[in-house]
Regions:
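Histidine-rich, glycine-flanked metal-binding segment
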Residues: 23-32, 36, 49-91, 106, ...
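Bacterial Sec-dependent N-terminal signal peptides
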Residues: 1-27
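Polyanionic/metal-chelating signatures
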Residues: 143-283, 388, 408, 414, ...
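Tryptophan-anchored aromatic micro-motifs
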Residues: 40-44, 430-452, 459-468, 508-522, ...
Length: 1003
């Protein structure tokens, strides 16, 4: 008898598994110690995302893979499972899931008024949305129903987190079996989980996206301070936990494509490893995402076509919604072609059909199959440092894999069983068990026949070969019963042979009733499964539909570039000592104004005949709230100097384009007026199509929004808002004074610390970095400048007095409708004014407002500007400037400066823009007539020498948009006719922000 020799590697594994067989859990009865091997033979095995083998064997013992490959020796007493050509795939890894987790105790709602501080028991964070001390493993329970759903989608591993809050705690790595939790949890701690959403927190702060970002940044700086000795001053278990896990990857939930850029900025600032979940629209800003080097988590959730049966309703669907429906399935392909690493998640998919249909659709539209597998296996395993356990089928890895009758990307693909931790689970769903391919058919012990079974378009058909002749077979299948009907007569006409029976894996068997009365038994054994042909080769050549930059109506198909342009014979409003020049040329080269004069020439420059046109510098809106995302106010505290508008720019806001059409080239984006010391502002140039960072005005020193009056003291906030200090105008003065006193002390503390030698520093705790006080110190040192919401003269006077006391200047009073009452004091102080042109009597606080205010201030020698504070008014600021002539008798030149040069001076950017002079930025507008005229139209707008608006192009765009909408609506109609589900038309309208807009809570 031949001796059976166990390979050396198996002996090692036997020792390992003997140890593993022990458990801390007692059993009622005789414990069963099973060390049985299981061999899956004659399988097509996808070992990793880019390696597969045919007719191979996978050998496992208990919950580990022992070996995989061709010609693997099968141990004695091994359970052998012949897969007859079925496929084995490693279990997918779901990285964004709340599987099995439940938030322990949600915060309680405060009965009355705002909630400033967490009431959670213990030495934890002051903010309920910050709880890095939570461990999902502590609140984990196996969820058999959900596990079954995920197994049907191919997932055998879940990275589960508590999906609530901003800093959510740690996630765990669990398998998706039904065994007890101690058998399923692989790693109790594997990543951190963060987001911008405060979740179930009942605290007011943060109420905006910029507040969430500031809270994350401040918490991370607090963690550094705590690690460097702050723990000796106070105990904070949240910071302690955060420091313990900062080396872990962070799975960061974003809610839109721009959150990827926002989160990446935080990751870069603190040198953290973020893996960021997107929303499926990453293709819209793929080039920007690539620059971050971020790995993104991509859902396979594609929007349904709209029900466009009503043409009137259909006309209201924005172009961007229609385009997203068409382009969303190309998302993963575009990311792949841009070399952006991504992980696929099933999050958002309702069932396995939606998931696999969308996965196959992505592949059919050009995503390579190995790239799809990489996103489900390799990327999550390596990014989460679990590649030794999951993501492939290599020796000593966990025995997590699924078996399917066809390859993953075949339309006939179905999972028949899923092995989790070595335990096999049937996948319960409606699918066919009959494999297409060549069968050997035996009927009543007669000579075998060749039976070919075909499957196409969810229908079975067959063909029997008898010698050279072939006869069609009608197949009816209702799991597990099958019926085959055929005739061997010429033209298949005549008595029928009927085979009825049932299907068991690769075999069919049952009773036969032949055409001439005999009956008996029959069986058919699968000999050769159908060889799959790549049917997507042609589809993969599909051209990606056109994109827009930004992804919005009126976007560019390619981003415009600066051109050298010579404007001839224009009426030029220089805003310089030369005044208005007739029949004058302006040359722009490389984004700058190169020359202003007569009879200019330049080889290679585009020549534009501006005869009869007026050429001006671009309008600058000193007070705007466009292009801001998820909240213009962080109105929850009286001092929020830590928040930054620059963190939440929305570069695809269509108001940018609309204002370019009104001659605006720069906008100063302000925090609202909900608190005395609000957030840091952001000056942008309207570079339509650029990303948020590229829109920021280079060389601008930085400003911050202050506010006075009824908004600050919450006069009209309701009876429940009588808690936050201050509640009076007197209190506002004390609050601001106290803030600057704290800032002075903070600055001194850091100054004293920085004077110490490195040796002394090493032995003491450094001061705590405070983002709020950092901004206030910049004000004290005139590195950041105030623009203050103001109406009443007494308060205006009060703030100037505070500034004088602390040795700085209030740069700008905005609104300033009582400025005419104390223009002399403003001039003495050095303050500027940014006012409405003619607003009055819209609330009691402005009872003394007059439309002559701006002209009176200007005539006093105060730098005065007119602003919009409104997205619609900003499109007509040229007409607002004209009111300086109508009400105040200003000259046309002085009136025009109210919206061009003067705001540039207020914002400290007049060396760069605001007038037509050699060396300045080519921010230029071409008007059809005098720009102060109601009849004048903006024909072209240039920013840095790039034409972002052209009236002629705009008219063509209108036609294009209508044609494109018509095409896409017809495509949706075709999809509906083809059987696609649809969604009802529901259009959301973006809110236009103003100073007093509040309540944009981050949920």
């Amino acid at each position: 008898m031949k001796a059976f020799i166990i390979p050396a590697q198996l002996l090692v594994c036997l020792f390992f598994y003997a140890a593993r067989g022990q458990s801390t859990f007692p059993e009622n009865g005789i414990p069963t110690e099973t060390k049985t091997y299981t061999a899956y033979i004659h399988a097509n095995i996808q070992i990793s995302y880019n390696q597969s083998i045919r007719d191979a064997t996978l050998l496992i013992q208990d919950n580990k893979i022992i070996d995989v490959g061709n010609n693997i020796p099968v141990p004695k007493d091994c359970v052998v499972k012949d897969l007859n050509g079925s496929w084995i795939y490693p279990s997918f890894i779901e990285v964004f899931s709340n599987y099995g987790t439940k938030y322990p105790d949600k915060p309680k709602q405060q009965q009355y008024g705002p909630k400033f501080v967490s009431d959670k028991s213990g030495a934890y964070s002051w903010n309920e949305a910050i709880h890095p001390e939570l461990h999902a493993a502590d609140y984990f329970a196996v969820d058999e129903k959900r596990a079954e759903q995920l197994r049907a989608m191919g997932f055998g591993i879940s990275i589960s987190q508590i999906q609530d809050g901003i800093m959510r705690g740690t996630s765990l790595m669990t398998m998706l079996g039904n065994e007890k939790e101690n058998k399923q949890i692989v790693k109790p701690v594997v990543t951190q989980a963060w987001s911008f959403q405060k979740g179930s927190s009942k605290q007011d702060y943060p109420s905006s996206l910029m507040g969430s970002i500031a809270l994350i940044r401040q918490t991370l700086y607090d963690a550094q301070w705590y690690k460097n000795g702050g723990n000796e001053k106070e105990t904070n278990l949240s910071l302690q936990a955060l420091n313990s896990y900062l080396q872990l990857p962070v799975i960061f939930e974003g809610t839109d494509e721009y959150d990827i850029l926002r989160a990446s900025k935080i990751a870069n600032e603190f040198k953290l490893n973020f893996i960021i979940k997107g929303n499926g629209a990453e293709y819209q800003i793929a080039d920007d995402i690539k620059q971050t080097n971020a790995c993104v988590i991509v859902p396979l959730t594609y929007p349904l076509p709209y029900d466009v049966s009503n043409p009137i309703d259909a006309s209201y669907i924005p172009l961007v919604n229609l385009k997203h429906w068409e382009l969303a399935p190309y998302n993963t392909r575009i990311l792949f072609e841009k070399n952006i690493p991504f992980i696929i998640t099933a999050s958002g998919c309702k069932n396995e059909k939606e998931f696999f249909d969308n996965l196959r659709k992505a592949v059919a539209l050009g995503l390579p199959e190995d790239a799809a597998l990489k996103a489900l296996l390799f990327e999550p395993a390596h990014r989460l440092n679990i590649a030794d356990l999951a993501g492939a089928l290599n020796k000593n890895m966990l025995a997590n894999f699924f078996i399917s009758t066809y390859s993953l990307f075949s339309p006939e693909f179905k999972i028949t069983s899923h092995i989790i931790n070595g335990v096999s689970y049937d996948v319960k769903k409606d699918f066919n068990d009959v494999k297409a391919g060549q069968y050997r058919l035996m009927i009543n012990k007669m000579a075998p026949l060749d039976l070919l079974v075909k499957y196409k378009d969810n229908q079975y058909s067959g063909e029997i070969s008898f010698g050279e002749a072939k006869y069609p077979v009608s197949i009816s299948y209702a799991k597990p019963n099958i019926s085959l009907t055929y005739s061997l007569n010429k033209d298949s006409v005549g008595p029928l042979n009927v085979l009825t029976g049932y299907v068991t894996r690769d075999t069919m068997k049952g009773f036969s009733t032949l055409a001439y009365g005999s009956s008996g038994m029959w069986s058919a054994q699968l000999i050769q499964p159908e060889i799959e042909v790549d049917t997507t080769a042609v589809e993969k050549t599909y051209k990606i539909p056109s994109l827009m930059y930004p992804f919005q109506a009126f976007g560019f198909d390619t981003l415009p570039k600066p051109k050298n342009v010579l404007f001839k014979n224009a009426t030029v409003w220089t805003n310089e000592k030369d005044g208005i020049l007739r029949n004058t040329d302006v040359l722009i080269i490389n984004g700058k104004i190169s020359a202003v004069g007569e009879n200019l020439s330049s080889s290679g420059a585009q020549v534009i005949d501006a005869t009869g046109k007026h050429l001006t510098s671009g309008i600058i809106d000193e007070h705007s709230h466009i292009a801001i995302y998820k909240g213009v106010n962080e109105g929850t505290q009286s001092v929020t100097a830590e928040v930054r508008i620059g963190d939440v720019l929305l570069p695809n806001d269509v108001n940018i384009y609309r204002q370019l059409a009104g001659g605006v080239t720069a906008s100063h984006l302000l925090h609202g007026s909900a608190n005395a010391i609000g957030g840091q502002t952001q000056l942008i140039k309207l570079r339509w199509g650029s990303n948020a960072e590229a829109m920021k005005f280079n060389g601008w020193p930085g400003f911050i929004k202050f506010a006075l009056g009824e908004n600050v003291k919450q006069s009209n906030w309701g009876d429940q808002n009588r808690v936050r200090f201050p509640q009076t105008r007197m209190g506002v003065e004390q609050l601001i004074t106290d803030a600057f006193n704290r800032a002075r002390a903070y600055e001194k503390e850091w100054s004293n610390y920085n004077k110490l030698s490195p040796k002394v520093k090493a032995g003491i705790t450094p001061p705590r970095r405070d983002l709020e006080l950092d901004a206030l110190v910049e004000i004290l040192n005139q590195q950041r400048f105030i623009t203050c919401h103001s109406y009443v003269q007494s308060e205006i006077n009060m703030l100037m007095h505070i500034a004088d006391t602390f040795g700085f200047k209030v740069n700008t009073f905005t609104h300033i409708l009582e400025g005419y009452k104390l223009a002399d004091k403003m001039k003495a102080h050095g303050a500027g004014a940014s006012s409405f042109s003619d607003w009055w009597a819209y609330k009691y606080e402005v009872i003394d407002a007059i439309p002559h205010n701006g002209a009176l201030l200007n005539n006093m020698g105060i730098i005065t500007a007119f602003n919009s504070d409104d997205a619609e008014m900003a499109r007509r600021l040229n007409q607002e400037a004209a009111k300086g002539v109508m009400y105040g008798g200003l000259s046309e030149e002085e009136a025009w400066k109210l919206v061009t040069l003067n705001p540039a001076k207020l914002l400290h950017v007049d060396p760069y823009t605001g007038s037509i002079a050699k060396g300045k930025d080519a921010d230029i507008v071409i008007w059809s007539d005098n720009p102060l005229s109601n009849y004048s139209r903006c024909e072209q707008t240039y920013v840095d020498g790039i034409c972002y608006f052209n009236l002629e192009r705009n008219e063509k765009l209108d036609d294009y948009i209508q044609a494109e909408k018509k095409r896409l609506i017809q495509k949706m109609n075709d999809a509906k006719s083809g059987g696609s589900q649809t969604q009802p038309i529901s259009i959301s309208v973006n809110q236009l922000y103003h100073c007093d807009t509040d309540g944009q809570y981050v949920k």
